[in-house]
């Protein structure tokens, strides 16, 4: 069964491992599988920010890593950098900075971004050298693959796949629909 035609219960946010923004009481949970080097994910980042501003406390956003290493050679390392920032309580500022500078994701750039978001650089450097967060990134990828994710960005609203292959405007429509179903 394709991800286009089924409701996916495995998309529920996991408070222990996911990066979540928004009220726990939100009616809609929007989960994205994305990569920091993906050009369409950059566009989606702007669309998601608009959704978050528009829907406010009705929307809870979850970001999961899905770096496509074959196409985006720096995406996996950028995902590790985001996880390292998350370990220091700075995931979202790093997430936003990585999307802002998605064409510049080499190690030297990531170190600069780590400094910009206020990370302990000694800790960051050690964790990146040891690939402390690689397993978490790979777990996100495996979880996405289990759900049928093959490309990025991939979105789910309350467990239902949103096909954005014809445009990101479908995100807004899907969130509206999910809200109506909750009413």
What are the functions of these language-model segments?
Residues 1-12, 183:
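N-terminal targeting signals for export/organelle localization
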Residues 4, 32-34, 40-50, 112-183:
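C-terminal cap of thioredoxin/glutaredoxin-like
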Residues 10-28:
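A short beta-strand-turn-helix
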Residues 12-13, 58, 97, 120, ...:
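Short, functionally important structural connectors and interaction interfaces within domains
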Residues 20-21, 105, 128, 162:
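Short clusters of hydrophobic/aromatic residues that line enzyme substrate/ligand-binding pockets
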Residues 26-115, 120, 125:
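Structural alpha/beta surface segment adjacent to cysteine/selenocysteine redox centers
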